[in-house]
Amino acid sequence: MLLNQYTFSAERCTTPTSISHPPLACPTSPPPTNSLNRYQHKPVTLAPTVDHGCEINGTTIDCIPKDSKFYQLIMDLKQLLAGKGLSNEDIDVEKVKQLMADYDSNEIDWQHLALHDPSRNYSRNGIINLNGNANLLILVWSPGKSSAIHDHADAHCCVKMLAGELIEHLYDFPDHEGEELQCRQETSMKRNDVGYINDSIGLHKMSNPLQNRVSVSLHLYTPPYASMYGCSMYEASSGRKHHVDMSKYYSWQGQLVNEKESSTC
């Protein structure tokens, strides 16, 4: 499948530089805290499993050249998170962000992992399970499309722009159902920008403002609560909350897994 300058493989699996734009967390937001605890999740680690005959959530990766900087980023993240408990208080977010910022995006490194379903707003491609307490994904955003307004299930979310542009729309949690959600901040992210959000900052939605090309972003979620327990999306007109299962990837390590039923919010 040829999309703009990228060629994305869609084979079904049959075996088990400097940041010049503001970050996601705007300066006027409350300072991030590692103590979230909105959901009270049980401390169960993310384990490998099988989906449509393909092993997902594995902790190793062989489909990236070991001499690439992208592979080195993954290994650095894995080492940083090694030995950490499955608790949001254990994570050094600033070090995670710095590692992601140090990587200069190169399409050759990751384009075979960035599969895209043009019929959906965005496609979630699983890359690796980091020690059972974090997962790394590449999201491919269809032109002009966005996610729903959503939370992050008491997890930290670090985002690295790999290509294109995204706009973050930031919202406060509603005090009660029936309250219309008002966007309080919009932030643009372009190639190599790194951002961060957790539930103490608020809700957000992400949108691709480009009308003629996809945008691509790298996401690290730690702990990986959304994949394990799901998250919540919110109706903009009423603040009504809906639980969403986020366990189904569109692809895993470049192999198509869920062509028709992958999870998005």
From Swiss-Prot:
PANTHER family found in the cross-reference section: CYSTEINE DIOXYGENASE, CYSTEINE DIOXYGENASE TYPE 1
Cofactor binding comment, as recorded: Binds 1 Fe cation per subunit.
Name of the gene this protein is made from: CDG1
Cofactor field: Fe cation
Consequence of gene loss (knockout): Displays reduced hyphae formation in the presence of cysteine and leads to attenuated virulence.
GO biological process, one term: L-cysteine catabolic process to pyruvate, using cysteine dioxygenase
Stated name of the protein: Cysteine dioxygenase CDG1
Species this protein is from: Candida albicans (strain SC5314 / ATCC MYA-2876) (Yeast)
General function of this protein: Cysteine dioxygenase involved in sulfite formation from cysteine. Plays an important role in filamentous growth and virulence.
Residues noted as binding Fe cation in the record, renumbered to the chain: 150, 152, 204
UniProt xrefs under InterPro entries: CDO_1 (IPR010300), RmlC-like_jellyroll (IPR014710), RmlC_Cupin_sf (IPR011051)
